[in-house]
Amino acid sequence: MSLTDLTSLETIIETAFDNRDGVNVSTKGEVRDAVNTSLQLLDSGKVRVAEKQADGNWKVNQWLKKAVLLSFRLNDMEIVTGGPGESTWWDKVPSKFENWGENQFRAAGFRAVPNAVVRRSAYVAKNVVLMPSFVNLGAYVDEGTMVDTWATVGSCAQIGKNVHLSGGVGIGGVLEPLQAGPTIIEDNCFIGARSEVVEGCIVREGAVLGMGVFIGKSTKIVDRATGEITYGEVPPYSVVVAGTMPGKPFPNGEPGPSLYCAVIVKRVDEKTRSKTGINELLRD
């Protein structure tokens, strides 16, 4: 699709969203067509909710999030097939795999084992492995990534190339508030089992999160080497584990409760990261 066509599509979506109280299941014409086209483009990976720029910053295409939100107003509840044992669900968003056969799966080039759930408008690139997991609408999962058992990729989340999302990992979805950016895991990251990255936080390229690390916008990320405290972004090629910081004392002077934080225990270069096992990196 040309840039002119995308601009026209964006204009229709923006106008419809500004007047969304009038959008419902009876709405026809260019609004419905524009929303459906936007979701198809997301589903195919031809557009994405966020794109990394040359300077390393991420540009968020808010109009695509608006298209996803409008789809909830346009679509009625319906039977969704494909459950275990021929069971069904009741929802407004069909499966990405609805009406897929062998040819479609071979062309897509990824593996989806039984009980992997992907909602329509999520993009899954070639050589991705989806264990029994959940990928929500508008998400983008890039080439060579492993989405392990019971991992969740939230709505509009952006997952880079060759990422490993370990068992039970949660990558938060961000549709609202609209001004918030999606949660982003850049290329070559390792996210340890049962960890959570949410609220539009960014894990930069090559970073390693140990098991059970929780990062939201208000989580203190402490660099052990410098004492610097940051929020919302894990630096590239950093190794992060769960930790605590001393809390404020009680009014009587006794020590207060310690508070959770994420701790950067070391930073490595790209060469070291590529040659060193994850467990070895986390031992320190």
Swiss-Prot record:
Sorted UniProt keywords: Acyltransferase, Amino-acid biosynthesis, Cytoplasm, Diaminopimelate biosynthesis, Lysine biosynthesis, Repeat, Transferase
GO biological process: diaminopimelate biosynthetic process; lysine biosynthetic process via diaminopimelate
Molecular function as annotated in GO: 2,3,4,5-tetrahydropyridine-2,6-dicarboxylate N-succinyltransferase activity
Catalysed reactions listed for this entry: (S)-2,3,4,5-tetrahydrodipicolinate + succinyl-CoA + H2O = (S)-2-succinylamino-6-oxoheptanedioate + CoA
Cellular-component GO terms for this entry: cytoplasm
EC number: 2.3.1.117
Superkingdom assignment: Bacteria
Residues involved in substrate binding: 111, 148
Enzyme class per UniProt: transferase
Gene3D superfamilies: Hexapeptide repeat proteins (2.160.10.10), Tetrahydrodipicolinate-N-succinyltransferase, N-terminal domain (1.10.166.10)
UniProt-listed Pfam families: Hexapep_2, THDPS_N_2
UniProt cross-references to PROSITE patterns, sorted A to Z: HEXAPEP_TRANSFERASES (PS00101)
Pathway: Amino-acid biosynthesis; L-lysine biosynthesis via DAP pathway; LL-2,6-diaminopimelate from (S)-tetrahydrodipicolinate (succinylase route): step 1/3
Compartment(s) where it occurs, according to its Swiss-Prot or TrEMBL record: Cytoplasm
InterPro entries, sorted: DapD_Trfase_Hexpep_rpt_fam (IPR005664), Hexapep (IPR001451), Hexapep_transf_CS (IPR018357), THP_succinylTrfase_dom1 (IPR023180), THP_succinylTrfase_N_sf (IPR037133), Trans_hexapeptide_repeat (IPR050179), Trimer_LpxA-like_sf (IPR011004)
Database matches in PANTHER family: 2,3,4,5-TETRAHYDROPYRIDINE-2,6-DICARBOXYLATE N-ACETYLTRANSFERASE, ACETYLTRANSFERASE
UniProt record similarity statement: Belongs to the transferase hexapeptide repeat family.
HAMAP family reported for this sequence: DapD
Subunit relationships: Homotrimer.
Name under which the protein is recorded: 2,3,4,5-tetrahydropyridine-2,6-dicarboxylate N-succinyltransferase
